[in-house]
């Protein structure tokens, strides 16, 4: 049973409404919840927002006492609110977890350097430990270098693969086995739409999972914001006056996700519940038995337990996606005669540089 906060507060209007809060019936409603159009006051909004996240955490057994948890911190609204709320709920409900901020520096000048400055301020504000790992150190490439070599249209493909592996590598170095990310309901619904548009039905069910992990890896990922609308996260950050970075990534306008996002906006204007509805559809989606068998045939188990033979990262192929992408980049860089000297190694020419591999990852 919901109990509304009783402390009175004067709040600034966001909506021109005259109704009282539909929950406490005592303060003026200033917010219309996007997911159900419920009109509530600011205090009740804080309460239901935090309570819903807590219920998601508890009902899915996301944490256990004594667990070390890394928050994937980018400085944006989602990860900033996630770090704030997770710290708040950990203290309020005594989860007994240790929270660490884990940031990845992709090497995008004018974007990531500014957002990391926000993360460092958050670290001071929330009094949480912070660790930063860079593409430059992990892969000997920055995203700016990758875009210069491979072009902007494929930037999100490269960044998505490398960032996922970078988070795992960072967590492994910190001996942390649980990474939480700020993916929200909008993100998950967009992913479902993207998979449908691409005809990638095999990923539909996985794209809506609140907890994911790779076979053989002790590092799991979870999304406490699975049922949180992006608009509500923005409102929460605004009314809580949280310090976050709001500039879009330099290369994001070329991303295919933008197409799905525009579709979502059109759907939501007609049916506000469409975001949750799409997630529910993904959750209940069952692959045909024939399709399942076809996909299973493509996965080959090797003697080393499905690990990349170059870097040790989990992979269904002999060479993981990251190593394949980096090899292609090195070949392209060699073709345009851009030479990079590897510290401690003799000067190499052309394709010989492709032989350089990532630091071997062990779990």
Swiss-Prot record:
Pfam families, A to Z: ATP_bind_3, zn-ribbon_14
Protein name in the entry: Cytoplasmic tRNA 2-thiolation protein 1
Keywords recorded for this protein, A-Z: Cytoplasm, RNA-binding, Transferase, tRNA processing, tRNA-binding
Organism: Vanderwaltozyma polyspora (strain ATCC 22028 / DSM 70294 / BCRC 21397 / CBS 2163 / NBRC 10782 / NRRL Y-8283 / UCD 57-17) (Kluyveromyces polysporus)
GO cellular component: cytosol; cytosolic tRNA wobble base thiouridylase complex; mitochondrion; peroxisome
Role this protein plays: Plays a central role in 2-thiolation of mcm(5)S(2)U at tRNA wobble positions of tRNA(Lys), tRNA(Glu) and tRNA(Gln). Directly binds tRNAs and probably acts by catalyzing adenylation of tRNAs, an intermediate required for 2-thiolation. It is unclear whether it acts as a sulfurtransferase that transfers sulfur from thiocarboxylated URM1 onto the uridine of tRNAs at wobble position. Prior mcm(5) tRNA modification by the elongator complex is required for 2-thiolation. May also be involved in protein urmylation.
UniProt-listed Gene3D superfamilies: HUPs (3.40.50.620)
Family membership noted in the UniProt record: Belongs to the TtcA family. CTU1/NCS6/ATPBD3 subfamily.
Enzyme Commission code(s) on record: 2.7.7.-
PROSITE patterns in UniProt: UPF0021 (PS01263)
GO molecular function: nucleotidyltransferase activity; tRNA binding; tRNA-uridine 2-sulfurtransferase activity
Record-linked InterPro entries: CTU1-like_ATP-bd, CTU1_C, Ncs6/Tuc1/Ctu1, Rossmann-like_a/b/a_fold, TilS/TtcA_N, tRNA_thiolation_TtcA_Ctu1, UPF0021_CS
Keyword rRNA-binding: no
Keyword Magnesium: no
Gene: NCS6
EC class name: transferase
Subcellular location: Cytoplasm
GO BP term, pick one: tRNA wobble position uridine thiolation
Origin: domain of life: Eukaryota
Pathway membership: tRNA modification; 5-methoxycarbonylmethyl-2-thiouridine-tRNA biosynthesis
């Amino acid at each position: 049973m919901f109990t509304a906060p009783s402390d009175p507060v004067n709040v600034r209007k966001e909506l021109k409404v005259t109704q009282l809060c539909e929950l406490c019936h005592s303060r003026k409603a200033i917010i219309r919840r996007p997911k159900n159009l419920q009109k509530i006051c600011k205090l009740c909004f804080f309460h239901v927002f935090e309570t819903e996240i807590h219920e998601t955490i508890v009902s899915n057994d996301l944490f256990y006492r004594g667990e070390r948890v890394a928050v994937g911190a980018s400085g944006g609204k989602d990860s900033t609110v996630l770090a704030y709320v997770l710290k708040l709920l950990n203290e309020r409900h005594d989860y007994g977890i240790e929270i660490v901020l884990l940031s990845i520096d992709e090497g995008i000048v004018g974007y990531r350097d500014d957002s990391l400055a926000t993360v460092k301020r958050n670290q001071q504000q929330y009094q949480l430990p912070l660790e930063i790992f860079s593409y430059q150190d992990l892969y000997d490439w920055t995203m700016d270098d990758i875009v210069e070599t491979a072009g902007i249209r494929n930037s999100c493909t490269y960044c998505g693969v490398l960032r996922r592996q970078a988070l795992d590598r960072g967590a492994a170095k910190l001996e942390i086995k649980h990474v939480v990310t700020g993916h929200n309901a909008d993100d998950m619904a967009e992913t479902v739409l993207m998979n449908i548009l691409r005809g990638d039905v095999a990923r539909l069910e996985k794209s809506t999972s609140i907890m994911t992990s790779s076979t053989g890896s002790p590092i799991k990922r979870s999304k406490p914001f699975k049922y949180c609308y992006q608009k509500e996260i923005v409102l929460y950050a605004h009314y809580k006056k949280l310090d976050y970075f709001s500039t879009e990534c330099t290369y994001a306008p070329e991303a295919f996700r933008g197409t799905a996002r525009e579709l979502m906006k059109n759907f939501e204007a007609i049916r506000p519940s469409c975001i949750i509805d799409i997630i529910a559809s993904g959750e209940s989606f069952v692959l045909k038995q024939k399709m399942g068998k076809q996909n299973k045939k493509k996965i080959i188990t090797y003697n080393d337990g499905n690990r990349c033979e170059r870097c040790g990262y989990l992979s269904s192929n002999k060479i993981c996606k990251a190593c394949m992408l980096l090899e292609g980049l090195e070949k392209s860089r060699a073709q345009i005669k851009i030479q990079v000297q590897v510290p401690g190694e003799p000067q190499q020419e052309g394709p010989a540089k492709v032989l350089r591999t990532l630091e071997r990852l062990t779990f």
